[in-house]
Amino acid sequence: MAPGEKIKAKIKKNLPVTGPQAPNIKELMQWYCLNTNTHGCRRIVVSRGRLRRLLWILFTLTAVALIFWQCALLISSFYTVSVSIKVHFQKLDFPAVTICNINPYKYSAVRHLLADLEQETRAALKTLYGFSEITSRKRREAQSWSSVRKGTDPKFLNLAPLMAFEKGDTGKARDFFTGRKRKVNARIIHKASDVMHIHNSKEVVGFQLCSNDTSDCAVYTFSSGVNAIQEWYKLHYMNIMAQVSQEKKINMSYSADELLVTCFFDGVSCDARNFTLFHHPMYGNCYTFNNRQNETILSTSMGGSEFGLQVILYINEEEYNPFLVSSTGAKVIIHRQDEYPFVEDVGTEIETAMATSIGMHLTESFKLSDPYSQCTEDWSDVQITNIYNATYSLQICLHSCFQAKMVENCGCAQYSQPLPRGADYCNYQQHPNWMYCYYQLHQAFVREELGCQSVCKEACSFKEWTLTTSLAQWPSEVSEKWLLSILTWDQSQQIKKKLNKTDLAKLLIFYKDLNQRSIMENPANSIEQLLSNIGGQLGLWMSCSVVCVIEIIEVFFIDSLSIIARHQWHKAKGWWARRRAPACPEAPRAPQGRDNPSLDIDDDLPTFTSALSLPPAPGSQVPGTPPPRYNTLRLERAFSSQLTDTQTTFPH
């Protein structure tokens, strides 16, 4: 072999092993682990210590298994072209239905309690409008009965005087009882008006409320005289009814047999036994159908009006309070079985002499809690005491919060809400300042100054029924005569008069279809997607994987911190050893640098050959050690053969 070829063969032999040219599998695997970009395999080879090497083997094999699993799922999903469609019909639970008469109590049962209030109300109406109310025989009797007290001082008008202001001049007002003008020193608070307005648009009607010492007063005005008088009447009405026991109020209201004339559900007859009494402070006796306190929850398997709830209600217009309510009919609210029916807030009114059809669509919503939204899954994270015997809702929280503020600031509870534990309802005798306190607190609540709106949260899961209401005249002119005659005969035990169509109302509640709409919130970025996105970015830009991240943690955190700690430990040990060692005399300093006359700093640094020819420093002695035996040096095995072929013999 030529000398050049021999040299090339020697160099090639000593170069790193490449792939298939490796002499055996062990060296091939060693070469792969040292040169691959798969960091885990490299860490298996270069790691020192059996435990660390074993951990890297475990991490790498786990990562390989996960890669095969994920790739198999992706390939299987790619080649799957079939689709699966499920059509599922099921029975839907029928909601609870609460029905109330708009008039809470029979007028004949409560007129003796409200006689003085009605007398002063009629006097105020006569002063404002200049007319006296013409009523039926029963109401004329009540009016003549209350006129006996004509010579007495007005009780309710003194507590909260009704006044009429001229627009633009709030310093003087006309008193409703005396008809005279008087000076008013009070804050004017204007309440939003409804539809009706007084005949003289130049006047604004309101009533005055003062604190105990009458030093602080406020006048609440309405641009509608009807609204002002009804609000004033309602305020005193709540004060009177708050002093009546619950048992007496239930007896003064309508029974289930009186309110419900006929009942059908899902084509099957029902009666008052299928309804549960619910007494509302402002609506009297209400009755709830399909309440689970009675029996199991009813369900329906078909949509349409024939498979829902059908009832005929007896309204009894003659027993209506003329000042408390100005319309006739009933209120109905659809809700869950464990939910409190807020009749005054979300109730639907039912007209008399009409058939009201309510079609329902069920929507079930599920929201994500913190940190995605400010909703609550239960009452645990809301610092408000639940005064309702029902599950959590935003309305329950707001009303409970206001009632708690009412008890805290006014010393009593507001009549239209449930009574908190240990509190009493407000009334004049025990709490003479409650009216003024209530209105002041209500204004602060509307302006969101009580903090209730910030504390209360929406519920994360709830059911909602979307209602579609339609009306039809009922009964028709051709069927009115025979239908009313039969209903009068059927209800002769409960109703002692002949029925007319203005006393009745028909109600139909049903599912329009059995499709349930579900709205569910899911995180837009889950933890799996987050890890996938981060891994994709690391792999794209840095060729890094989970194993690479573990390697970085090992090198830059574990090993680096260990080295720093070891260095600091040795440094501290050296400092402590020097401190404890005895002081030694300092050796004379040898001439170096510019002190050495043999060194010229302007010249270039000497090479190894030129350094041997430099003269020794002054005063230095050449050591007497004999020169080394150069033939005893041993070179690396990898270069021994090369030196044999290429070395040149120099003469000694």
From Swiss-Prot:
Q: What InterPro entries does the record tag this protein with?
A: ENaC (IPR001873), ENaC_chordates (IPR004724), ENaC_CS (IPR020903)
Q: Where are the annotated segments for Disordered? A: 610-631
Activity modulation: Originally identified and characterized by its inhibition by the diuretic drug amiloride.
Question: Which residues are exposed on the Extracellular face of the membrane?
Answer: 76-537
**Listed GO molecular functions?**
ligand-gated sodium channel activity
A Pfam family found in this protein is: ASC
Q: What name goes with this protein?
A: Epithelial sodium channel subunit gamma
| Keywords carried by this UniProt record | Cell membrane, Disulfide bond, Glycoprotein, Ion channel, Ion transport, Membrane, Phosphoprotein, Sodium, Sodium channel, Sodium transport, Transmembrane, Transmembrane helix, Transport, Ubl conjugation
Membrane-spanning intervals of the chain: 55-75, 538-558
* Entry membrane topology: Multi-pass membrane protein
The record's PANTHER family line, in alphabetical order, gives:
AMILORIDE-SENSITIVE SODIUM CHANNEL SUBUNIT GAMMA (PTHR11690:SF19), AMILORIDE-SENSITIVE SODIUM CHANNEL-RELATED (PTHR11690)
- Report the SS bond pairs: 100-286, 210-217, 263-270, 375-460, 397-456, 401-452, 410-437, 412-426
What PROSITE patterns does the entry give? ASC (PS01206)
Catalytic activity line of the entry: Na(+)(in) = Na(+)(out)
Any coiled-coil regions, as ranges: none
Q: Which residues form the signal peptide?
A: none
